[in-house]
């Protein structure tokens, strides 16, 4: 992707800000909690594996949550989240590395650093169990190569979630060696959400790859739809956070992590 290729202005602004942010200091070395193991444990316990996302705000959300992120994280885990995603992008999402550090120290589930990493030195900003690399952003001029970044991240101990949107991007992720792939239902060109995106792309992804459906998952029916299409886990932000101080984050998380299990639990109880 060069700078002339269509991309939503809000996303272009995020990309431009990511170019300006510097890297870390000393090279980090991480001993991560396993994301695939966390998903398997959740499924074995009768829960839908969900990565619950802590983001104070976003360009596509109304309002902002001022709750203590650690409190939110603990509520999400109590609600059954298998893992957490913490925004560290400061300019558009209100995130920070300090928040990630506090959350990771407070919970016993894997924590994803949700940011827009373009260069190797940006890996060394903060420790996390998982980092995000976005194929479309890494096609932009002046960014590091996806395969090189994937290798550099693994050398530091990170697990890597490689985000895609199209079949072509999935192919690039697989060619680079990705073993955890996310399919974003949101088109970064128009910001429109279509759950059919995941359904169209998922069949191209080998079974030995951990597959995560991202964006647009709001209801129990959406959860079932994505799981039926092959998602090993779901990354959910707005439907849990809702950017409303009155929203019950724990209840929202539980509603979605139990979306595919209520009928089973009811049957078992009745028996």
From Swiss-Prot:
Pathway: Amino-acid biosynthesis; L-tryptophan biosynthesis; L-tryptophan from chorismate: step 4/5. Its EC number is 4.1.1.48. Pfam families: IGPS (PF00218). Keywords: Amino-acid biosynthesis, Aromatic amino acid biosynthesis, Decarboxylase, Lyase, Tryptophan biosynthesis. GO terms for biological process: L-tryptophan biosynthetic process. It is an enzyme of class 4 (lyase). One of its GO terms (molecular function) is indole-3-glycerol-phosphate synthase activity. It catalyses: 1-(2-carboxyphenylamino)-1-deoxy-D-ribulose 5-phosphate + H(+) = (1S,2R)-1-C-(indol-3-yl)glycerol 3-phosphate + CO2 + H2O. Belongs to the TrpC family. This is Indole-3-glycerol phosphate synthase. It comes from Haloarcula marismortui (strain ATCC 43049 / DSM 3752 / JCM 8966 / VKM B-1809).
């Amino acid at each position: 992707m060069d700078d002339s290729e269509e991309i939503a202005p809000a996303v272009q602004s995020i990309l431009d800000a990511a170019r300006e942010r510097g890297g870390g200091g000393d090279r980090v070395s991480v001993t991560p909690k396993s994301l695939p193991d966390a998903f398997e444990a959740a499924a074995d316990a009768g829960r839908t594996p969900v990565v619950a996302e802590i983001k104070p705000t976003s360009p596509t959300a109304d309002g902002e949550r001022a709750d203590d992120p650690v409190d939110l994280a603990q509520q999400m885990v109590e609600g059954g989240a298998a893992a957490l995603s913490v925004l560290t992008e400061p300019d558009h999402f209100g995130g920070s590395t300090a928040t990630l550090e506090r959350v990771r120290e407070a919970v016993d589930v894997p924590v994803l650093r949700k940011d827009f990493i373009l260069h190797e030195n940006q890996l060394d900003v903060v420790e996390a169990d998982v980092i995000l690399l976005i194929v479309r952003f890494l096609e932009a001029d002046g960014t590091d190569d996806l395969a090189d970044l994937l290798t550099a991240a693994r050398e530091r101990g990170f697990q890597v979630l490689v985000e895609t949107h199209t079949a072509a991007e999935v192919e690039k992720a697989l060619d680079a060696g990705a073993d955890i792939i996310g399919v974003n239902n949101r088109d970064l060109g128009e910001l429109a959400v279509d759950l059919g995106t995941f359904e169209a792309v998922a069949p191209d992804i080998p079974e030995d790859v951990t597959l995560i459906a991202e964006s647009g998952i709001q209801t129990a029916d959406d959860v079932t739809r994505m799981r039926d299409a092959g998602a090993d886990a779901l990354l959910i932000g707005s439907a849990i956070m809702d950017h409303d101080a009155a929203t019950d984050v724990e209840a929202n998380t539980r509603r979605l992590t139990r979306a595919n299990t209520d009928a089973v639990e009811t049957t078992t109880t009745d028996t």
